[in-house]
């Protein structure tokens, strides 16, 4: 499925609270906390963490979770949108390890080191978070922008074909210009493992003066060409530049992500 959009939003399938028969309290903005940094044995560095929690949490209820990368730049934007759209979702923000020129971010968002970053998220970060907070482990989203948007695409392809760790994927103007031939081959390799690819995947392209739209379109095309079953692939394109496209599109992205 492909959509070209300039703005707007659609109804959300996650909350809002007034859609639940059991709600007794009106929606309240979520709680935002800075957590201690977590160290990784897979990547050898530590990552500062943030978390957003639904304010009126209900006992014995679990909530969808979004693992959002680049949290030092994107966390507040996404959390603000969750509040605006009255969504009961847990948001885990993973900040970057800061080195010169953010080289760690660049290297670990690309193949093959993306495998180690994915191992950190799925085997170290998520167990740490999900033993402390009421996460619905069958409704996980991974979200990234630029280089980490590329990483989101790689996660889609490297995840377990039978029991994927993530069920939803959001890539904002991903840097799919990096190793294009390899990425195309990874799509083909994943298709060879099986036709089923269980995900709702949203690809956002920025077609302003500065943006990765040409390469986001390529990745969308490769996925369409592979003809995966169970892949709900949504392409959204905006007349925006590379950085502003996240804030411009996030409302539509989140409501599309959780629509029925």
Functional labels for PLM-detected ranges:
Residues 1-4:
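Sec-dependent bacterial lipoprotein signal peptides
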Residues 209-260:
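C-terminal catalytic histidine-bearing segment of alpha/beta-hydrolase fold enzymes
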Residues 203-206:
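Short beta-strand/loop motif that positions the catalytic acidic residue
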Residues 6, 10-63:
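A domain-start/cap signature at the N-terminus of enzymes
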Residues 138-187:
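Primarily recognizes the serine-hydrolase "nucleophile elbow" in alpha/beta-hydrolase
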Residues 62-134:
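Serine-hydrolase catalytic machinery in alpha/beta-hydrolase-like enzymes
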Residues 71-75, 96-100, 147-150, 175-178, ...:
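Solvent-exposed loop/turn segments at secondary-structure junctions
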Residues 83-86, 164, 190-198:
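Short, conserved loop/helix-junction motifs that constitute active-site signature segments
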């Amino acid at each position: 499925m492909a959509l070209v959009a300039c703005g707007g939003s659609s109804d959300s399938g996650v909350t809002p609270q007034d859609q639940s028969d059991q709600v007794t309290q009106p929606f309240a903005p979520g709680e935002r906390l800075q957590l201690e940094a977590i160290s990784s044995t897979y990547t050898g560095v530590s990552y500062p963490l943030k978390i957003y929690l639904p304010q009126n949490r209900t006992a014995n209820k679990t909530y969808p979770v979004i693992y959002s990368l680049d949290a030092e730049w994107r966390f507040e934007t996404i959390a603000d949108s969750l509040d605006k759209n009255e969504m009961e979702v847990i948001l885990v923000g993973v900040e970057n390890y800061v080195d010169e020129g953010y080289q760690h971010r660049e290297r670990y968002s690309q193949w093959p080191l993306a495998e180690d970053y994915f191992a950190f998220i799925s085997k170290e970060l998520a167990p740490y978070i999900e033993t402390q907070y009421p996460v619905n482990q069958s409704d996980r989203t991974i979200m990234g922008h630029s280089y980490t948007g590329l990483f989101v695409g790689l996660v889609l392809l490297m995840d377990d074909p039978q029991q994927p760790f993530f069920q939803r994927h959001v890539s904002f103007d991903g840097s799919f210009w990096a190793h294009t031939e390899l990425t195309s081959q990874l799509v083909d390799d994943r298709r060879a493992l099986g036709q089923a690819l269980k995900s709702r995947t949203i690809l956002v392209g920025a077609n302003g003066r500065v943006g990765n739209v040409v390469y986001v379109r390529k990745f969308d095309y490769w996925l369409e060409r592979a003809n995966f079953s169970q892949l709900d692939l949504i392409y959204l394109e905006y007349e925006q530049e590379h950085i502003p496209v996240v804030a411009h599109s996030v409302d539509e992205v989140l409501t599309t992500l959780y629509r029925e």
